[in-house]
């Protein structure tokens, strides 16, 4: 963030939405559709695509999902200097059930190793002065 003019800081979760097949259960039914998501990450990417200087502050696992977010943020031109990587906890996967009419219902999480998820362990950080 040094030397950059950040207009917006998006703080929060970066996760995977695991969409099950229509009328199926994303925990057990195939095929599933994994999508990078999380409202703060989505907003950060949208703002960057509009040309707004933005930094994302959050925490992801040191796993394939975390690597996908690092890559996505780089491709979108986001400042990810406040993105933390967790070597112990995994990135969060949200199970999303889709009704036959397309409505979505969030039904829980996948990948829990009984130690929580990376986004739950966000460490305090120094933010740039306003």
Predicted regions and their residues:
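Conserved N-terminal subdomain of the carbohydrate kinase-like
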Residues: 53-130
């Amino acid at each position: 963030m040094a030397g950059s003019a950040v207009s917006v800081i998006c703080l929060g979760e970066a996760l995977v939405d695991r969409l099950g097949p229509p009328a199926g259960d994303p925990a057990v039914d195939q095929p599933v559709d994994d999508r990078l998501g999380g409202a703060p990450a989505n907003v950060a990417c949208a703002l960057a695509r509009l040309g707004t200087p933005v930094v994302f502050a959050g925490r992801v696992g040191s796993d394939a999902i975390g690597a996908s977010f690092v890559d996505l943020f780089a491709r979108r031109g986001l400042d990810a200097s406040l993105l933390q990587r967790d070597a112990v906890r995994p990135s969060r996967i949200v199970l999303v059930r889709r009704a036959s009419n397309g409505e979505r219902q969030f039904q829980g999480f996948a990948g829990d190793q009984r130690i929580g998820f990376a986004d739950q362990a966000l460490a305090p950080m120094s933010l740039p002065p306003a």
